[in-house]
Amino acid sequence: MRKRVQTPKNKEFTMAFSLPPLPYEMNALEPHISSETLEFHYGKHHQTYVNNLNGLVEGTDNASKSLEEIITSSDGGLFNNAAQVWNHTFYWNCMGPNGGGNPTGSAADAINQAFGSFDNFKDQFSKSAATNFGSGWTWLVKNSSGGVEIQNTSNAGCPMTSGNKAVLTIDVWEHAYYVDKRNARPAYIESWWNLVNWDYVNSQLEG
């Protein structure tokens, strides 16, 4: 999404990227994730990545590229900010106020085939997220064989750079949970399961 803004010299230019709207209200994920967390995580952290990315692409050929094109063709600060914009947008869509419960449809079939049962998958995914060292993301991805697997990435890492398609993610950077859970990442992970938007997961598997 492009956004036109005024510079200090009153010259109009088009920002390459803007912060996508949340798919729900700031308080919609309570009591599992507070509105205060979203105000900081979405309103400040995610916005900062968007601002940084616009600063890096302004006046370059990258300003006309998609996030996916930048992510798969760059490194360093450009990659980090582009990937974090994409990762966070994907993360918000993976949750919803009417989420949680067991998967259905394509997600249930893929998870049962790969892990034997949803309980096995939930246990393995939770352990991977809890032990993902430092800052990063834990993903359920669709691999090149068409099956699903768990993938951990560090910092701004994104599955598309390894040829996998993201279908579900949890953000395990501390800013995702520190307001609500302090340093208790496992407690955040357990609460997060109540928010998983399985309809969105199905759409990613089938798309």
Where are these regions (language model features)?
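Feature for soluble, non-membrane regions of globular proteins
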Residues: 10-207
